[in-house]
Amino acid sequence: MNNAFCGSFLSEYPHSDNRYNNVKELLSRAYLTPICSYVGAVLEIKDRNMDNGGIDATVELPPNKDRLVPLRIDVQLKATSSPRIDANGDNLQFDMKVETFRRMSSKKRCCPWLLFVLILPEDIHDWVVVNENELIE
């Protein structure tokens, strides 16, 4: 399917249209939320200033008997409905701003900084499915 209607837009656009970037970001955040809850981590969503700097969220695990201090990971949240996999089929190839990549890979950062990419179906109608048997598939 080349074009699809998304409830927040009045017209159909190609699924790769930039208008869907906000929807993709919110879906990646929504996907990470129950994962953090399951492992007992706190998910802190950052405000626009940090988001513009490349940090969308911070995941923290509290101290426990094996870890005396909290474990903190900064996260850049992304999503794509047109993933590119390398020739070996092992790695996702994902374009990002050079400046953000340099910040993420800097040795001067205070904690690990991960890129979290949610791979969505190509068909927008399959991004979120709600039916009487399941809340969200």
Predicted region positions:
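Mixed-charge (Asp/Glu-Lys/Arg
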Residues: 1-53, 59-137
